[in-house]
Amino acid sequence: MNKTAEEIVESRRCASEGLTNALTSITVKMSSVLVVTVILLSYYFARLAIRTLWKNNIFSNSTRLILLVCLLNSIIHQTTMLEIRIRQIYRSIVFASEPCRLPFHFTECEVELFVYYLTTYFSTYSVFSLAFDRLISCYTPKYYLSHQYYVSIFLLFIQLIFTLGTYYVGLYGVPPLGYEPFCNYAPKLATNFVKINDFRTLIMGICIIVTVFVYYLSVKSEKQIQQTSYSPGERYIAYENVAASQSVCILIVLQFACILISSLGVNYLRIFKSTLSDEEYNKLAPFFVGVTYANLCLPLVIHCKTKLTIRNRKLRIGVMTSMYGDVGEHINRLKKSWE
């Protein structure tokens, strides 16, 4: 990086008039209230989701381990974002009339940036682990059932490699220079930021295709079993596979939709930044925290989908046992119907 570029970012110590107006505006304060509310709700539902996975788990052990790790990651991410927002609100109130003390220097945000982006990328690539966990369970069910923890640990390891690789390409070695209004904003000298967001979007798109395909295969397999098997146990297992695949599919689609807000949304904001005033841009940007929204959806879906599945499971078991009984009873009913 040439010296001129470093001098330029270092010289922008004081907030412009537009940035000052934005940071002290009701709009940005409302965005912080929204984000803090989302974070507090995510804490509540994360507690419920962890308890649900521990006591009333409807997923395989492999999927459960992945979800538990993702929930712990989400708590760390939300806590980091909460600290970032509280610092910004405090500074916007205390230094409202001092534009040169409103922005944060990169060195004031190094810890937050490190934790924030590592947990952000780990959340993004959780869709990879969940999608391929379902794919492996679909194509190699016997191996999957006997090696569930190995499968989940292997997928989580790949997820971690993706996370560290993305952080290395995007932020590792970036000079600690420049000023930002929020500590979660990417440094101005991070030149690969847009490419990273595009790569994250591509990975999530591929994972959605894989998950929808696995869900289709699960539904197709269940229909075949319903037509050819009279064993309540086999029919029940097929139903459970569909329920698990459906839950993971919902999780991934919601994660994708939320994370798309921060990846594509931020990219488009940067592209059209020249058409927006400094004040307009900085009023909109604080709302684009997709991973924070996704970290609320994750425990919410786990908890609500588990309750719904347990209720449907009881109904399904009742229907299967009352309708079919054992195979002998079913054959006797068929004989009577053929007489």
Swiss-Prot record:
Transmembrane segments: 26-46, 65-82, 112-132, 151-171, 199-219, 248-268, 284-304
Gene Ontology MF terms in the entry: G protein-coupled receptor activity
Membrane topology: Multi-pass membrane protein
Record keywords: Membrane, Transmembrane, Transmembrane helix
Any GO BP annotation: sensory perception of chemical stimulus
Pfam families: 7TM_GPCR_Sra
GO cellular component: membrane
Record-linked InterPro entries: 7TM_GPCR_serpentine_rcpt_Sra
Localization annotation: Membrane
Record-stated family: Belongs to the nematode receptor-like protein sra family.
Name the UniProt record assigns to this protein: Serpentine receptor class alpha-24
